[in-house]
């Protein structure tokens, strides 16, 4: 098995199919793989759900997520660059230890890393998840 490492993490605000703003994260690897994932808030927010970072400005009734996307573009990108894309647990643990990072950005990046890891190993996503 060859190793593939994270080259770049980027994120942007997108308008989702549920008619709310979400974060689309893209993970690029050294071997040229690109994987994307979108995270948006649920219809109802339960007590065990992560709290999302919203812009709280006039645009999108305060529900924009450009600040959250920026935390992925800066903090998360800097920390994950060079990590083995197939080491999902290590990557998630690293992101969970970060301070001042939006949970919605972490969720989107984690899902994009998961997809990139499966592509890197050339296995179906379900197989990568299940080991």
What are these regions (language model features)?
Residues 1-22:
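Short, Gly/Pro- and small/polar-rich lid/capping loops
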Residues 24-26, 125-131:
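N-terminal glycine-rich phosphate/pyrophosphate-binding loops that anchor nucleotide-derived ligands
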Residues 43-123, 127:
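Metal- or metallocofactor-binding catalytic centers and their adjacent structured scaffolds
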